[in-house]
Amino acid sequence: MPLVKRNIEPRHLCRGALPEGVTSELECVTNSTLAAIIRQLSSLSKHAEDIFGELFNEANNFYIRANSLQDRIDRLAVKVTQLDSTVEEVSLQDINMKKAFKSSTIQDQQVVSKNSIPNPVADIYNQSDKPPPLSILTPYRDDKKDGLKFYTDPSYFFDLWKEKMLQDTEDKRKEKRRQKEQKRVDGTTREVKKVRKARNRRQEWNMMAYDKELRPDNRLSQSVHHGASSEGSLSPDTRSHTSDVTDYSYPATPNHALQAQPATPSYTAGDAPLHGTTNQGAEHEYRPSSASARHMALNRPQQPPPPPPPQAPEGSQASTSVAPADYGMLPAQIIEYYSPSGPPPPPPPPMIPSAQTAFVSPLQMPTQPPFPASAVSTYPTPPHQPSTGLLATAPPPPGPPPPPPGPPGPSSLSSSPMHGPPVAEAKRPEPAQPPISDARSDLLAAIRMGIQLKKVQEQREQEAKREPVGNDVATILSRRIAVEYSDSDDDSEFDENDWSD
């Protein structure tokens, strides 16, 4: 059915019934025909006015466009006359700063919409019957939809077509994304390489230093190197300890309970409490060196040490005799070192001051719980060979284990400044302080928050790109064509599945 834009009334000039009682019928028909012609002329004049009005509007729009184009041409003509290529060159910066001309074509669309309806069609539309007043039922609906749209909806077909086009465009985009991911997976399938374990070169060289038949077990070597692995990993304090121990070459025991092998010689009973208390603090600050630990692990036989020097008089023994500075012995070993069944202890060797022995403070000496005499004396250890050039004293071969000594005298651990309350206070762990709020401490949180905000912002930008710019046919079709024929997948970087969590 064609849509009539302009209709001329009346359509029939001479068609009509003559009234009764007319004497001259010919004159009546002529007059009615002339009146119909006049009405048609008036209708034509009205349509002519509408047509010329539309032509005037079109001509006015054309004049505006031509005028703007003429203004641009005039400005270009002025610039061309002022530009002298022989004097001044056009800089690339000026060219890059200005955008190139791009024509924006306006496509004709929504011709039959209510806004673009011409006046004759609007008149015909107004003459038609009105729909029933179903819009008064809209406030009573739960879904808040317009009640008139269930009877007549001018945008129904457009909305249906728009939904279908957008769904097809989204399906095309997902298909391209799936193909792109499939190509990426096919291109990146390669063998996963295993990470090579780091090697400890120093430990390997230490193992190679021994003969094949004398190399220690892996477990022993790991425990030894756990206590003192290498010189490069020791602190300056530990290096000074090891230097002192190697200089005096006294028997040393590792810090492990299974490798503690004390030597238990016998001495007089009167000197046991004195020497056990005076040297208990001094022996605690030293740790066994790696060299002595290796000797303990290997259990290699050593030559017996030279006999001790002659015994000092009884009068000067109580004031001058001091236990040898065995840096690796435990308190129980020192007490057993001077048992009541042997000769009195020998005088100490000359002390060589070092960075650790010259300045000793009570707080720097860690305390160790003494082992029982019965458990310690179960594993005897042969004495080590003394270093050349230094006088070293060592106990004779081990004998039967003596009974554990009694409680020390009044000048025992309680009166020693090394084992007083300051040591317990220094041993007590300090309470954890609350973390100080600093800008640097919040750097990681700020970075994470910035990344999250950036992701959300990019997601919103991509969602804005997905939405059509205009709610019209041309924009929707252009976007679908762009998705089908484009090689890039910029609009589909962020999938809704990636943001579901």
Swiss-Prot record:
- InterPro entries cross-referenced by the UniProt entry: SCAR/WAVE_fam, WH2_dom
Q: Where is the composition biased (Basic and acidic residues)?
A: 182-192
What molecular function does GO assign, one term? Answer: actin binding
Q: Phosphotyrosine (modified residue): where?
A: Y151, Y248, Y337, Y485
Known post-translational modifications?
Answer: Phosphorylation by ABL1 promotes lamellipodia formation and cell migration.
Please give a single GO biological process term from the UniProt record. oligodendrocyte development
Q: Which UniProt keywords apply?
A: Actin-binding, Coiled coil, Cytoplasm, Cytoskeleton, Phosphoprotein
Q: Which GO terms describe its cellular component?
A: cytoplasm; cytoskeleton; glial cell projection; glutamatergic synapse; lamellipodium; postsynapse
What ranges does the record list as Low complexity composition bias? Answer: 411-422
Q: Where in the sequence does UniProt note compositional bias of the Pro residues kind? A: 302-312, 341-352, 394-410
Q: Which residues form the WH2 domain?
A: 439-456
Disordered as annotated region, ranges: 170-443
Q: Where in the cell is it found?
A: Cytoplasm, Cytoskeleton
Keyword Cytoplasm tagged: yes
User: Which Pfam families does UniProt cross-reference here?
Assistant: WH2
Kindly give the Gene3D superfamilies that the UniProt entry links to this protein: 1.20.5.340, 6.10.280.150
Give the comment on domains.
Answer: Binds the Arp2/3 complex through the C-terminal region and actin through verprolin homology (VPH) domain.
Function text: Downstream effector molecules involved in the transmission of signals from tyrosine kinase receptors and small GTPases to the actin cytoskeleton. Plays a role in the regulation of cell morphology and cytoskeletal organization. Required in the control of cell shape.
What does the sequence similarity comment in the record state about its family?
A: Belongs to the SCAR/WAVE family.
Q: Mind telling me what this protein is named?
A: Actin-binding protein WASF3
